[in-house]
Amino acid sequence: MRDEVLEFLRQNQGGFVSGQDMSEACHVSRTAIWKHIKALRQKGYKIESYTKRGYRLLEEPDLLSPLAMKQILKTDVFGKRYVYMDTTESTNLEARYLAQQGAEEGTVVVTEEQAAGRGRLSRGWYSPFGKGLWFSLILRPDFPPVEAPKCTLMAAVALTKAFHKMGLTDAGIKWPNDILVNGRKLVGILTEMSGSMEEISHIVMGIGVNVKTKQEELPEELKLIATSLAMEDIDIERTEAFRLILEELEHQYYEVLDSGFDETLNEWRQLSVTLGEEIEVRAPGNTYEGVATDIDEDGNLLVRISDGTIKRIVAGDVSIRPRK
């Protein structure tokens, strides 16, 4: 009902709509219409009202509501089922539950705020209300489980290409899937697979993008290591950023389903800020220092250490050393 009231106001943008007309069209009382108007105002919609003239929509908040996204999203699959919440503990937890209940491929779970967002290596992810894109995507690919880890590289490629379209051409990928701008982290990606040794049941891809956060709003421990689109002087509505990202993710994913991961891995190499750099890798049980030379066909990082041997890194935390 609230969406219907909002749509009435949108259709008459710049003009007034009477409460009586809306109540008759929606088959509810004028008091009910007023309550919906009040609720919309509380969500940030600027609606003015005058006796005998009705209501007029002046400005909409930058919310990721289903109605806002439905108007602009041009994907075929991603986001066709769109689960939206004001707040949740974690979109990955919500998406995992939906996937276990049989939610279709392309289901998007998005929230305005996460209470317990998670990144790689079980780290927390700062997810304040209305400041970023905090969402998870359900995938049901038909490739073998051994290929699943490369989905995280695929996502990093898609998001980086989307940022370039927004004008943020300095965005690049630190292995495996952190997206950095001048050394500061813009995006976190967490991919979780469920299935057997032979078959993938589903993949839940959790993504956090800092969009509107300002430097002074960051927690003290993030001030020197995090960034946002706003901090990089990219002025974009969250809905538009989300549209570009979902469309790029869908395009990249179906390219992989059609043709495999080879081209995506080549694109990853081109967008990497890791390859060719001196790095330190903290891998399970070992720490290595050397030069990142390439990724292999499985997306693992190849590092040439001081004695000339090549170490293959399957999992670990990479730090890029400043150039001398």
Predicted regions and their residues:
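Long, positively charged amphipathic alpha-helical accessory segments at protein N-termini or as interdomain linkers
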Residues: 1-28, 42-43, 147, 153-171, ...
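N-terminal lobe of the biotin/lipoate ligase/transferase fold
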Residues: 2-164
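Short, basic and Ser/Thr-rich N-terminal targeting/leader segments
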Residues: 78, 103-105, 175, 184, ...
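Structural motif
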Residues: 81-82, 106-108, 133, 172, ...
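Short loop/edge segments at beta-strand edges and connector loops
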Residues: 86, 173-175
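Conserved active-site carboxylates
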Residues: 178
